[in-house]
């Protein structure tokens, strides 16, 4: 399996590649302090100092109440940061993405195409690829210093996967009332966030079939869309997840930031989710082995990252 990553369709510096085998994600925050501090500064600028402090405290207590397996790592990352925000940033879930999984035109396995959009400035400039290792083997994690979860990754000889965010559930005419209701629902749950479930999958699942089972059946703290791509031509799917319910679409399939397999009222995420989805669906298996597919509306003002994984 191969992994290609770019931060935009222009000439940019090469993305750093860190070997964290035997070291862990805390070592990345310690070893790449320039990028780590830049991301923390961007978070403070985006959320504001007050929300970073309050959100950090709430996030820390919730992780402790859930007995989250990565809470200790995040606490160590927070100590490295020396400022509030690491707990909040690790639970931030505001990105918009476009992803697809189809048979690779080379005839070898499946191919995952993926962009990540986020209003937080600096994510593209500060992205890294980290080689990590769990019980099931090594994997390449497209990540940022200070982040303990997995959003996009590829495990050679096993599978690749990515997370998209569903719409915010709509309960009322008011955006802020809906935001509050959804946050209250989250704080009452004692399940793992999707980014931590995906990390566990890369750490422990040895096959596409195992990964699909875990992503389909594990209770979640909040809804998520998982795209999973294996090494065989028929190993590909989009898993649309509610907290305790699952809707699977087999490959070829695409996903942006709206429900396709389920009909759940929600508030839109990102720029032109339907347009991004429609373009990705139309591309199918005809995409060249490059980033020419990253064009409007898949490419927009908040696009920070593009990935091709086979």
Over which residues does each language-model region extend?
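C-terminus-biased signal that marks the final domain/tail of proteins
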Residues: 1-105, 202-310
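A contiguous strand-loop segment
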Residues: 12, 42-46, 50, 65-193, ...
